Structure formats: C-alpha cells, structure tokens
Design a protein with these regions (language model features):
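Short, charged/polar N-terminal "headpieces" of proteins
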Residues: 1-24
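Acidic, aromatic-enriched beta-alpha/helix-loop junctions
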Residues: 31-73
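Generic "edge-of-domain/loop-turn" microfeature
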Residues: 11, 23, 32-34, 43-45, ...
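Compositionally biased, intrinsically disordered low-complexity segments enriched in polar/Pro/Gly
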Residues: 1, 39, 43, 76, ...
Length: 97
C-alpha cells in the first residue's frame, strides 16, 4: 500500500506510475462532494465518479488491473480537498498488498 500525496486545492490532476501502469487521476469539486476521472495508460476507465470514503475508486475488478485507489478519511467523512494531506489521504494498493 502506498500513499499518493495530494495538494489541498479543490481541483487537481496527478500522474503516477504504479504496478507497471501509468495512472492519471483528475480530482475535482462538484458542489459539496469530490469527483474523480481515472485513466490507465492513457485509456479512460471512469469519468465523474463520486468519491466516497474507504471504498475502492474503481468499483469493477476487471477495470482495476494491477491495483486500485481509495480515499481514507477519519470517521468515514466524505473526502474533501481542504483535508487533503491532513485527515484525508489517497492510497493505492497493488496485487501483493
């Protein structure tokens, strides 16, 4: 399992190499919740998914490939950008975790 650093800003895009794949996540505010777009190796997997705490971001095993992401929060709070890097973090885990 690996923590992915996030900035405490409302909208951001990040690219990381994990599990032999190139991932691109776009995290953005959608009114009072956070949404996410996910690409793996420049292929769009998901767009506009609502981010919920302590659950895999990619809900389908066949799309997740060699790993998956999740937002870990205190007290099952909905992930919110102002708490990134404090009590809300993004993690990735691979097949061996």
């Amino acid at each position: 399992m690996q923590e992915i650093p996030l900035n405490a800003v409302p909208n951001q895009r990040l690219r990381v190499s994990l599990g032999g794949d190139e991932w691109e996540l776009t995290i953005k505010v959608a009114r009072t919740t956070m949404c996410c777009d996910i690409k793996r190796n420049d292929v769009i997997l998901l767009q506009g998914i609502r981010v919920v705490p302590n659950q895999p971001l990619i809900p389908y095993r066949y799309l997740s490939g060699n790993g998956n992401f999740a937002f870990i929060t205190e007290n099952d709070e909905l992930p919110w950008w102002e708490q990134f890097g404090q009590s809300h973090s993004l993690i990735w885990w691979g097949e061996n975790d």
